[in-house]
Curated annotation (Swiss-Prot):
One Pfam entry name: Pribosyltran
Gene Ontology molecular functions: RNA binding; uracil phosphoribosyltransferase activity
Key word Protein transport present: no
Protein name: Bifunctional protein PyrR
Subunit structure: Homodimer and homohexamer; in equilibrium.
Originating species: Leuconostoc citreum (strain KM20)
Superkingdom per UniProt: Bacteria
Lineage: Bacteria, Bacillati, Bacillota, Bacilli, Lactobacillales
UniProt short sequence motif PRPP-binding, positions renumbered to this chain: 97-109
HAMAP family reported in the protein's UniProt record: PyrR
Length: 175
């Protein structure tokens, strides 16, 4: 297998900054906004976007991370647990949610995340932000905020590297 870097650290940072500005424009600041990162890498991206929002708008935005494993359509034993402790639970009722993930591919992870969010409350709106949209949708799901569109072949994979886990920031196509 070979890896081809398609976003370096600087490009990844610019993509997150662009997403942040688009979130500000859409939400007219940060009031009633909650960022929800899909574990694992979406969680780190959500925190980074929240930090940028705080720097730009002077408002601290709540960030929540959800584990959607039990809401996936390929998991047989559902226990409807999000793996959240009480400190991690944020009231999402009547809030404007931005759901954040690293890669949008078939749409199945996002569908599971939507099910998980509805399970814990009824938000006012839900928007989707992804660092990379690679196409090949199996469900009618579209991101509202996209860092970079990277068309791929069906047999290729997108690998998002984040400093917090991988020691560097980059996006690679794996052949």
């Amino acid at each position: 297998m070979t890896n081809k870097e398609v976003l370096d650290n600087a490009s990844l940072q610019r993509a997150l900054t662009r997403i942040t500005y688009e979130i500000i424009e859409r939400n007219k600041g940060g009031q009633d906004l909650v960022l929800v990162g899909i574990k694992t890498r979406g969680e780190f991206l959500a925190h980074r976007i929240a930090n940028r929002l705080e720097q730009l708008e002077g408002v601290k935005i709540p960030v929540m991370a959800i584990d959607i494993t039990n809401f996936r359509d390929d998991v047989l034993n559902h226990d409807d647990s999000l793996g959240l402790n009480d400190e991690e639970k944020t009231n999402i009722a009547d809030k404007n949610i931005v759901l954040i993930d690293d890669v949008l591919f078939t749409g199945r992870t996002i569908r599971a995340a939507l099910d998980a969010l509805i399970h814990i409350g009824r938000p006012n709106t839900i928007a989707l932000a992804v660092l990379v949209d690679r196409g090949h949708r199996e469900l009618p799901i579209r991101a509202d905020f996209v860092g970079k569109n990277i068309p791929t072949a069906q047999n290729e994979k997108i690998k998002v590297l984040v400093q917090e886990i991988d020691g560097r920031d980059a996006v690679e196509i794996v052949h």
